[in-house]
């Protein structure tokens, strides 16, 4: 169980193709034996990401919900999070002992953020293939997320991106806030993300409670 009232809600945002759904999949598979988990995804007109998680076997289908935001996906996680809050409430009613709810935003830009009503912790995912200037551009996702994930570091030599520059810029833009460089395809850096969620979110595994 969590160390606070209700399940820990972790919001995962980032541009289209950065690796949000891949991270959701890996987190579910890595944590489901130790914690009671549910996953919620956001898409504009489909439930593609939720269906992917079901096909991948991330969790059982009843623990995965897809929210069709219709229109701007940013609004559904910030200004009017009612659909996502309702999805969280439904999961809590089905699974009263939930420890963790992972909430993936629709593909968004650097200005998108999660409402504090919806997410207790926020993780923002960018990827190297978009260029090494991304961390320096700032925006709430870069500067204010609880954890910044710089994914697809294996592509750096192929796209002419400097990981050193991204490291320097991320430190400059984020100050004391942590970031991690990853290659989620090979699960490189995943352990650091897991450790961050457990420590920052105050999670206590089922094994520890037994």
Curated annotation (Swiss-Prot):
It comes from Rhodopseudomonas palustris (strain HaA2). GTP binds at residues 14-21. One of its GO terms (biological process) is urea catabolic process. Facilitates the functional incorporation of the urease nickel metallocenter. This process requires GTP hydrolysis, probably effectuated by UreG. Keywords: Chaperone, Cytoplasm, GTP-binding, Nickel insertion, Nucleotide-binding. The lineage of its organism: Bacteria, Pseudomonadati, Pseudomonadota, Alphaproteobacteria, Hyphomicrobiales. It is found in: Cytoplasm. This is Urease accessory protein UreG. GO terms for cellular component: cytoplasm. Pfam families: cobW. InterPro entries: CobW/HypB/UreG_nucleotide-bd, P-loop_NTPase, UreG. Homodimer. UreD, UreF and UreG form a complex that acts as a GTP-hydrolysis-dependent molecular chaperone, activating the urease apoprotein by helping to assemble the nickel containing metallocenter of UreC. The UreE protein probably delivers the nickel. The keyword Nucleotide-binding applies. GO terms for molecular function: GTP binding; GTPase activity; nickel cation binding. NCBIfam families: ureG (TIGR00101). Its main location: cytoplasm. Belongs to the SIMIBI class G3E GTPase family. UreG subfamily.
């Amino acid at each position: 169980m969590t160390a606070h009232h209700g399940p820990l809600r972790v919001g995962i945002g980032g541009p289209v193709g950065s690796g949000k759904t891949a991270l959701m999949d890996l987190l579910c598979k890595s944590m489901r034996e130790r914690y009671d988990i549910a996953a919620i995804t956001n898409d504009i007109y489909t439930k593609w990401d939720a269906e992917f998680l079901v096909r991948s076997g991330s969790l059982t289908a009843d623990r995965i919900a897809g929210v069709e935001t219709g229109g701007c996906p940013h609004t559904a996680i910030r200004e009017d999070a009612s659909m996502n809050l309702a999805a969280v409430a439904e999961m809590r009613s089905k699974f009263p002992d939930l420890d963790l709810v992972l909430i993936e935003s629709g593909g968004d830009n650097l200005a998108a953020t999660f409402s504090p009503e919806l997410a207790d912790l926020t993780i923002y995912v960018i990827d190297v293939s978009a260029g090494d200037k991304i961390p320096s551009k700032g925006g709430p996702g870069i500067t204010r997320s609880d954890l910044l994930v710089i994914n697809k570091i294996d592509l750096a030599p192929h796209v002419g991106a400097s990981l050193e520059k991204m490291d320097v810029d991320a430190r400059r833009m984020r100050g004391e806030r942590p970031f991690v460089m990853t290659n989620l395809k090979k699960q490189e850096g995943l352990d650091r993300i897991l450790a961050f969620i457990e420590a920052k979110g105050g999670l206590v595994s089922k094994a520890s409670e037994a």
